[in-house]
Design a protein with these regions (language model features):
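A domain-level signal for the structural core that forms small-molecule/cofactor-binding pockets
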Residues: 2-186
Length: 186
């Protein structure tokens, strides 16, 4: 069986044996674990070292096919010759990084001062992508919290918000996921 992709280098050793795309291998791992892989799910636990780079090449190939289907000259137009690679990197490492990378490490500390008043952090600039149309969502959020037994540094709220919003979402779900993640930390 031959590869459906123009560049056989995007396959890793296991893939050469099974003749599956890396996206299929990762998807199978997730399914075999009985987990979901919805648009806003983090799937980093199912991606082995080196596979994100292979996935990036697979996605670039698919983006190139999309551009060709849109009748865009990706071979001769200097403006679009490397667009597929740039788009692939952008989606995997920026726009959707909340799917493919672990949550950033955030250290919480005991609330030794017994802080009991609401404090607010914001505005925090957030960007995401609508999971229905994959169009950008840009905005600001404020986080208000009454400390419990633990507290985290103010800058950590922005770090967690960036990670949560860096997945395809509908906005209402993103806000609920952010609240759940903050609750776990505090």
């Amino acid at each position: 069986m031959t590869s459906t992709l123009p560049n056989d280098n995007i396959r890793n050793f296991d893939d050469q044996i099974t003749n599956k795309l890396i996206s299929e291998i990762i998807r199978d791992r997730i399914k075999n674990a009985g987990k979901r892989f919805s648009a806003n799910d983090n799937i980093s636990d199912f991606i082995n070292p080196g596979e994100l780079e292979i996935l990036e090449k697979e996605v670039a190939s698919r983006v190139r096919d999309l551009l060709k289907s849109l009748v865009i000259d990706v071979e001769n137009d200097h403006n679009t010759q490397e667009t597929a690679e740039r788009v692939s990197k952008m989606y995997l490492n920026e726009v959707f990084k909340g799917r493919y990378y672990e949550q950033p490490k955030v250290t919480s500390f005991p609330n030794d001062k017994n802080l009991d008043e609401i404090y607010t952090v914001g505005p925090i600039t957030v960007r995401s992508a609508c999971s229905h149309h994959l169009v950008p969502i840009l905005g600001e959020c404020w986080i208000g919290i009454k400390p419990g037994n633990k507290v985290i540094g103010l800058s950590k709220f922005a770090r967690v918000a960036d990670w949560v919003f860096s997945s395809p979402h509908i906005q209402e779900e993103a806000v609920m996921i952010l609240a759940d993640e903050i609750e776990k930390l505090c």
